[in-house]
A protein has these predicted regions:
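Metal-dependent active-site segment of extracytoplasmic phospho-/sulfohydrolases and closely related
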Residues: 267-318
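Anion-binding catalytic surfaces of enzymes that hydrolyze or transfer phosphate/sulfate esters
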Residues: 172, 177-267
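Internal helix-turn-beta structural module
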Residues: 299-363
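Single conserved hydrophobic/aromatic residue that forms the stacking wall/gate
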Residues: 1-6, 10
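Flexible, glycine/charged-enriched surface loops at secondary-structure junctions
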Residues: 84-91, 152-167, 217, 244-246, ...
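A contiguous, mid-domain pocket- or channel-lining segment that forms the substrate-recognition surface
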Residues: 26-152
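Active-site His/acidic residue clusters
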Residues: 52-57, 100-123, 210, 236-280
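Long, charged alpha-helical interface segments
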Residues: 106-199, 203, 208
Length: 370
């Protein structure tokens, strides 16, 4: 599948959404995830808590803040910087939300996970046109004030004393307005009911706009210590009633951003043995090769969001491998799941909505693009 380096673009693309029609940045999606209703002129932005060290951006996630810590800091920022126009909302861990009423979305922003170890001042948000200059100035002011406030916060002083990275600045990016997304149940008649299982706000927001129910799994963290077994069981249970179940695991992406090869390998093994294997065994307890749930045949697809090579520590815009196991599919010659082997797969390179239409058993239009 042809992917985009932007997570929010690709995650919608695999569900069949045309990025040119529905793209509004990840901010509005994360707003939907945490239940923030946006007015038409509300600019919603992902708001990372990051660690700056001198002139460099040291860590886009502050060494993985606990959500409780992030909540303390976001409430503190809302108390001191919030206004009728500006509102800070708590998300998950280091991933939070900034909403600017009447904000202009035409900004040039760099995701902080793209610039670890780089001079942060070179990547500060800028206006893409004259109309957005007021919004850009406001964001720069909020960032400057956040550095002043967070540096002296007791929580950060405690983190420094314990040898942890302080969350000493906000970093807004991924801004946009409320998107117009048609529910999947209207696009695909086969889907009467669907669900999504994830710990990540972005995916939860996409799920809400796509008309999917959100399944919460205790112990799902969005990191390598997530509850793989719990996600597997939740998927097995959901397949008794739902026509589509979207299970997302963030662990390998985070390991890639950390540049940690052993950890990334471990997350892949855990995905295989602790998530995929239990699901397949539950759907085919006799080992017949025929997957079933609630007396109906089941198709399973496995694919990553996008590459996050450990040596680059950021996303790349490269085709990603995928595998589909479904009734009636003739196996091809590919025996391993990796980028090189997948190039020889029977499906070739799929683009746009061709993946979801292939998976759903629908012939993609000849002109489908993405």
């Amino acid at each position: 599948v042809r992917s985009s380096a932007a997570s929010d673009v690709y995650k919608r693309q695999i569900l069949g959404y045309d990025q040119h029609l529905v793209y509004e940045g990840r901010g509005p999606l994360e707003a939907a995830s945490i239940g923030v209703e946006l007015a038409p002129d509300d600019l919603a932005m992902r708001c990372n808590l990051v660690c700056l060290e001198g002139d460099l951006l040291k860590n886009h996630s502050c060494g993985r803040l606990e959500t409780e810590e992030g909540d303390v800091l976001m409430r503190y920022l809302q108390e001191h910087l919030g206004s009728e126009r500006v509102h800070f909302y708590t998300g998950v861990q280091y991933r939070h939300l900034l909403v600017i009423k009447g904000g202009n979305k035409h900004l040039l922003c760099t995701p902080p996970h793209d610039i670890p170890g780089k001079p942060w001042r070179e990547y500060l948000p800028k206006a893409a046109d004259e109309a957005a200059e007021d919004t850009a100035r406001l964001i720069l002011h909020l960032m400057e004030e956040s550095r002043r406030l967070l540096a002296a916060h007791p929580l950060n002083l405690g983190r420094v004393a314990q040898g942890q990275d302080p969350a000493n600045s906000i970093w807004p990016w991924g801004g946009g307005y409320r998107p117009m997304m048609t529910p999947l149940t209207q696009t695909f008649p086969q889907i009467k009911r669907g669900s999504v299982i994830t710990a990540v706000d972005l995916i939860r927001g996409i799920g809400r706009y796509a008309g999917l129910r959100i399944i919460d799994v205790p112990g799902a963290t969005g990191l390598w210590d997530t509850n793989y077994e719990g996600k597997a069981q939740a998927a097995i249970d959901a397949l008794q009633t739902d026509d589509l179940v979207y299970v997302h695991v963030e662990a390998s992406d985070e390991a890639g951003h950390d540049g940690n090869i052993p950890l990334k390998l471990d997350t892949i093994r855990s995905l295989d043995s602790r998530l995929l294997k239990p699901i397949l065994e539950a759907l085919d307890p006799e080992g017949t090769g025929c997957l079933q749930a609630a007396g109906e045949p089941v198709a399973v697809a496995l694919l990553p969001d996008h590459p996050t090579p450990c040596h680059l520590r950021t996303h790349t815009n490269e085709p990603i491998p995928f595998a589909i196991y479904a009734p009636g599919i003739e196996p091809d010659s590919v025996l391993t799941f990796d980028e090189e082997a997948a190039r020889e797969g029977a499906y070739g390179l799929l683009q746009g909505d061709e993946f979801i239409r292939t998976f759903m058993g629908i012939t993609a239009p000849a002109a489908a693009q993405g």
